[in-house]
From Swiss-Prot:
Keyword DNA damage: no
Stored SUPFAM superfamilies: Ribosomal protein L4 (SSF52166)
Protein name: Large ribosomal subunit protein uL4
Function in brief: One of the primary rRNA binding proteins, this protein initially binds near the 5'-end of the 23S rRNA. It is important during the early stages of 50S assembly. It makes multiple contacts with different domains of the 23S rRNA in the assembled 50S subunit and ribosome. Forms part of the polypeptide exit tunnel.
Keyword GTP-binding annotated: no
Bias (Polar residues) ranges: 43-52
Length: 206
């Protein structure tokens, strides 16, 4: 089992924690991680884009001029794609971009992402993450104490003071342990996680 240091919000070492190898020490599967990221981004797409083909644009039923003798190129409709106001060739239509991964694949992708942070020494465990008031300045001080900039902060429970304090920092995202995903883990350089959140993740994914 990997043994990591535990810090307080002042950046001081206050203990250590053994991580479960079944979650934080698996063989990293980059293919599944990639699939999970693509799946998450695809599922976010609205898929509402739409344009009309020449068959759907109103008007243009009459031939604009006779076939021969005008000096113009022959035309059959003012709604052909080359005309202003005409239809679109291969017009985009609403579609569902989402695709699903099965539960086993999702689980292994999460484990791979967590393991990748441990292997890169980019996982910081906190004994707790509590704030008595909403103060972005204080939250920034915590990040400075931990020497991190771009981070995903994982909490064991929803804490409005922490969440609202971090909200205005563009390089930081907060999440609870039951809402982590591969995209956020790999997007942010460092994974900052509370000790209780580690226990919750190990309980869910073990």
């Amino acid at each position: 089992m990997a043994n990591v240091k535990v810090y307080n919000i002042e950046g001081k070492e206050v203990g250590s924690l053994e991580l479960n190898d079944a979650i934080f020490g698996v063989e990293v599967n980059e293919h599944l991680m990639h699939m999970a990221v693509v799946s998450q981004l695809a599922n976010k797409r609205q898929g509402t884009q739409s344009a009309k083909t020449r068959a759907e644009v109103s008007g243009g039923g009459r031939k604009p001029w006779r076939q021969k003798g005008t000096g113009h190129a022959r035309q059959g409709s003012t709604r052909s794609p080359q005309w202003k106001g005409g239809g679109v060739v291969f017009a985009p239509k609403p579609r569902d971009y989402s695709f699903k991964m099965n539960r086993k694949e999702k689980s292994l992708a999460i484990k791979s992402a967590l393991t990748s942070r441990v292997e890169a020494q980019k996982l910081i465990v906190l004994d707790s993450m509590n704030m008595d008031e909403i103060k972005t300045k204080k939250f920034k001080a915590v990040l400075e104490n931990l020497k991190v900039n771009k981070a995903l902060v994982v909490l064991d429970k929803k804490d409005e003071n922490v969440i609202l304090s971090a909200r205005n920092i563009p390089t930081v995202r907060t999440a609870t342990s039951n809402a982590i995903n591969v995209y956020d883990i790999v997007k942010y350089d460092t994974l900052v996680i509370t000790k209780d959140a580690v226990a919750q993740i190990e309980e869910v994914y073990a």
